[in-house]
């Protein structure tokens, strides 16, 4: 009986030790709406911060801006009088209202993530860590966004890292 109890205890401890994670389905976005799936990003709680593990395809090669946006929607909305892809996601997650884009380790937007790197085959599989984000609860019901082009993690010379249009989006549930 003692061995059985120890086995049950070990199973409970091992099961409880699993890190919380969430798989986010990612879709292409345009000013007309949400398009085809390009894969997923699994977000896992780690002792170093939230880890974002992409399994994405059909992306332009190179670096891309990668952010958490304030609202959990990938639908288009009107900005400056014209329809804009995934505009309903709002801006970068910034609960402290810093108004600054300083990258994942800076004191600005909490939604600033390390750049997403896409290989020459259009695939992104390299995980990145967001050290300031510790819990999935912080980003629940927000949007995960891939922007066209790189991100210099600054508001200079262009705002929001100089990244381009919103290219792919998924809602973190």
UniProtKB/Swiss-Prot annotation:
InterPro entries registered for this protein in UniProt: SOD-like_Cu/Zn_dom_sf, SOD_Cu/Zn_/chaperone, SOD_Cu/Zn_BS, SOD_Cu_Zn_dom
pH effect summary: Optimum pH is 6.8.
Sites where the protein binds Cu cation: 67, 69, 92, 147
Localisation: Periplasm
Signal peptide stretch: 1-19
Cysteines engaged in disulfide bonds, as pairs: 74-169
Region (Disordered): 72-113
Activity over temperature: Highly thermostable.
GO MF, one annotated term: superoxide dismutase activity
Cofactor entry: Cu cation; Zn(2+)
Keywords: Antioxidant, Copper, Disulfide bond, Metal-binding, Oxidoreductase, Periplasm, Signal, Zinc
Any GO BP annotation: removal of superoxide radicals
Residues reported to bind Zn(2+): 92, 101, 109, 112
The reaction(s) this protein catalyses: 2 superoxide + 2 H(+) = H2O2 + O2
EC code: 1.15.1.1
Role summary: Destroys radicals which are normally produced within the cells and which are toxic to biological systems.
Record note on quaternary structure: Monomer.
Listed name of the protein: Superoxide dismutase [Cu-Zn]
Organism of derivation: Escherichia coli (strain K12)
